[in-house]
Amino acid sequence: MVLIGNLISFYENHLYPEKKTSDGNMFLRGMLTVLLVLLTVGLLTAFLIYLGHLGGLWLYAAISTVVLYFTMTPRSLARDGLEIYHLLKDDKDLVTARKRLSWIVGRDTENLDESNIARGTIETIAENTTDGIISPLFYFLLFGPVGAMVYRAGNTMDSMLGYKNDRYLFFGRFAARLDDVLNYIPARITFLLFVAAAFLLRLDWRHAVEICLRDAETPLKSDHIMTSIMMMYGATILFIALETVLIYIFW
């Protein structure tokens, strides 16, 4: 993923205008950046898979497995969540918990209390369950290793370019919207899996579904469609009443 980040930075450095230009031109340059990154990642991954084919079934399977592995982040999700949990529950260390949360979210965490640190952690894990686990698997099953890696490139561009600030307001808009589209179906699959998990754990899954259907059209401070969906779905399953005290800087 570091290589994808470097590739994004390379194209951004070459396509981001040095002088002020029109909003439309900024958007087109950002869109071109996205398309070039996706094309490059797709071609390189396809070439790698082709080499695997030449080496036989076992080499192809090994390369495909490695590609899928690098597009998923289940361990980091669990590690980050548990670390913040223990900082709050065992150590009562709000300062370190705020700092640790700031590493995994694009939000202002400096003044959060214990309750809102917990909420922020749950929201982030709920969202990242989609883009760190379900979406890569979804596109791997549909389009193979190339699909999973192209998805990861699109998601990484959203995290690097999809900010609502002066630099990326128009340049990063295409990247942000593309990420919404890519995660539209996987986000809903994740919700169904959350409901299934709640059912198996004998939690109140019916209430979670009711709240989800009730609030599905409720706008949140974040314009990021997938983020809003997964925050609501995941937190509902976990019986957390979200408060919009966090300041979102993502689309």
Feature annotation, model-predicted:
Residues 1-149, 162-251:
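Hydrophobic alpha-helical transmembrane segments
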Residues 153, 157, 161:
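Active-site His/Glu-centered metal-binding helix of metallohydrolases
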